[in-house]
């Protein structure tokens, strides 16, 4: 076990799979006290079991629906009561976005649920955790944008997803402004296509589409959760103590080409 995050109490949402799982396991391996959550109880338990087997245990509140304010407050209050502080908040949870062209997208059934699952739950968690982050005196918020906050897609119709991730960029910059006087840093990570169960279910990590996207990267492959987790470790650690309001493109070079 390393110790880049030793002594840090970190909330990591969406630990049941994908990037959230990767961040939770990597943070624990780096010495953080991790309190995760997930809406899927079995998935959260599997991550807790994996961390236990690795000798770097984590805790979890599950099931937890982060689109419900009372559930968010329960999660934050549980962590704060158990550990007395919150130093890091990683908003990795998201609801699978609806993909449809703007002409076909239903407002109530597709557009609004996508924004609720990508923007509302980040706002709610930041709001609930904010007093504890301020009290910590030197804290870090890590939110997730996407390459699709910067560019559209010819392969998939993602009007709502692009809107949601663009909103995360803007919200996080404002969080950095508001948090600066209190020592609360806020940054975004904008991943490219990461191989997760969710992206596989969307058909994005295999076949012709995956090949097309991989070919657009400068490194010739799709990303993995740990590629993103290492960046999150840096942003959570004191190594990034003068970094705030920034975005980190972890995309294999897609946005550079």
Predicted regions: what they are:
Residues 2, 96, 100, 232-233, ...:
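Short C-terminal tail/terminal secondary-structure segment
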Residues 3-35:
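Canonical Rossmann dinucleotide-binding motif of NAD(H)/NADP(H)-dependent dehydrogenases/reductases
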Residues 73, 95-112, 154-160, 200-204:
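Conserved mid-core segment of classical short-chain dehydrogenase/reductases
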Residues 106-124, 142, 168, 219:
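Catalytic Tyr-X3-Lys loop
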Residues 117-135, 149, 176-177, 181, ...:
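Amphipathic alpha-helical dimer-interface segment in Rossmann-like NAD(P)H-dependent oxidoreductases
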Residues 138, 180, 185, 243-245:
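Short, small/polar-rich loop/turn modules that mediate ligand/substrate recognition or access, typified
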Residues 142-167, 172-181, 193:
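Catalytic loop of short-chain dehydrogenase/reductase
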Residues 177, 188, 211-239, 243, ...:
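C-terminal helical subdomain
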């Amino acid at each position: 076990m390393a110790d880049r995050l030793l002594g840090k109490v970190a909330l990591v949402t969406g630990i049941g799979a994908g990037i959230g799982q990767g961040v939770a396991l990597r943070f624990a391996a780096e010495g953080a006290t991790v309190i995760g959550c997930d809406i899927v109880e079995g998935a959260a338990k599997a991550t807790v079991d994996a961390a236990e087997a690795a000798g770097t245990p984590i805790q979890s509140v599950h099931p937890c629906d982060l689109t419900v304010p009372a559930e968010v407050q329960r999660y934050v209050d549980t962590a704060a009561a158990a550990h007395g502080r919150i130093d890091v908040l990683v908003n990795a949870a998201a609801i699978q976005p609806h993909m449809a062209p703007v002409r076909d997208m239903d407002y109530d059934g597709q557009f609004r649920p996508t924004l609720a699952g990508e923007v509302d739950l980040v706002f709610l968690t930041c709001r609930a955790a904010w007093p504890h982050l301020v009290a910590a005196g030197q804290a870090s918020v890590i939110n997730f944008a996407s390459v699709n906050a910067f560019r559209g897609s010819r392969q998939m119709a993602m009007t709502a997803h692009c809107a949601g991730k663009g909103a995360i960029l803007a919200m996080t910059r404002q969080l950095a402004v508001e948090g600066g006087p209190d020592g609360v840093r806020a940054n975004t990570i904008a991943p490219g296509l990461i191989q997760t169960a969710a992206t596989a279910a969307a058909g994005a990590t295999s076949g012709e589409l995956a090949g097309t996207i991989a070919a657009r990267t400068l490194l010739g492959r799709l990303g993995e959760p740990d590629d993103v987790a290492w960046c999150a470790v840096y942003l959570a650690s004191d190594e990034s103590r003068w970094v705030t309001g920034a975005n980190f493109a972890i995309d294999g070079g897609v946005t550079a080409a």
